[in-house]
């Protein structure tokens, strides 16, 4: 698996984001997009993005093939492209509720092989808060340039990683974790205990 490193637009890897969203949009209700004021929120099953609306044409429109939704309108992936979703959940509240920002998260250079089923495997990047490991799929991790983002999370349960652009805090990504194995938990305790 070759990880893309094509970072543009405030540290976002636009090609990786578009590729991921196109794959998720193949599922009905796989991708939701809403606009609230000058911000656009994009939510999938495993990631969420908050971007300034001015970035929508460059980052999201090639996936949705639609203009940016009007303020308060949500569009959703459907059988034949994206359509307006009536009675949509409030994506802004969902984003805010799942954006842990209690503690700084350390991103490590370590990758963990993870089974994905059907004799396949994938890679996860090891993040940690103290001795608490957080594994994030490398596909999600490759969507942002680690030099241009700060990471936050919490040690309660399996914390998502909340990446915030250092140059523009209105740009952020939430990445859901993978449950670490007992081996990873032991290793993390040994490596990062003080």
Model-flagged regions — what are they?
Residues 1-37, 41-51:
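Intrinsically disordered, low-complexity linker/loop segments enriched in Gly/Pro
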Residues 44-47, 52-194:
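C-terminal functional regions that serve as terminal interaction/effector modules
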């Amino acid at each position: 698996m070759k990880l893309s490193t094509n970072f543009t637009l405030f540290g976002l890897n636009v090609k990786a984001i578009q590729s991921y969203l196109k794959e998720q949009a193949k599922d009905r209700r796989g991708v939701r997009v809403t606009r609230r004021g000058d911000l656009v929120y994009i939510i999938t099953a495993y990631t969420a993005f908050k971007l300034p609306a001015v970035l929508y044409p460059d980052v999201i429109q090639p996936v949705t093939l639609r203009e940016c939704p009007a303020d308060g309108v949500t569009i959703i992936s459907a059988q034949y492209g994206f359509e307006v979703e009536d009675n949509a959940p409030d994506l802004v509240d969902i984003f805010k509720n799942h954006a842990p920002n209690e503690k700084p998260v350390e991103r490590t250079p370590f990758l963990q092989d993870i089974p994905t089923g059907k004799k396949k495997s994938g890679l996860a990047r090891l993040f940690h808060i103290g001795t608490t490991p957080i594994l994030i799929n490398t596909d999600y991790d490759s969507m942002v340039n680690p030099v241009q983002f700060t990471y936050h999370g919490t040690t309660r349960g399996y914390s998502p990683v909340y990446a915030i652009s250092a140059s523009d805090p209105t740009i952020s990504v939430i990445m859901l974790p993978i449950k670490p194995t007992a081996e990873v938990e032991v290793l993390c305790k040994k490596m990062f205990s003080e």
